[in-house]
């Protein structure tokens, strides 16, 4: 198994995304450019449940600040990304063919700073303290078959919503790899 950790990472050197105007109901998904989230992440991509760009991404209430401005207030600063405090991942495959992946990351509370005409400033929380977790167990079987269990979990401090998703994936092949059946439950 391999252990990777990062403490207060600075992804400032990472290539930025092109601006895209999305008028549809679904978010635009960008490729991951941060090396910590691209290296050794094959297990975490199973089932397509984990989108790493949300970790340390745009604060949950980034756009709500405009609706919370008082009379004669202007926005002084509104960070576009929640600051990542740490991230840890353990991944690898045991001799039994069991793939194990554990991921944990914490992003700090994020605040916008607003100021009124009298130079009185106040903070508006745009993202709570957030903990991201993923557990993946992937058992390889004979004939290139496999069964996987994936759990993703997001815990936020305060009144903001949490998320917990679990799924079981399966992929079965016959001896000659002629026939395949696969699917998921979750």
What feature does the model see in each segment?
Residues 1-186:
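Outer-membrane beta-barrel channel domains
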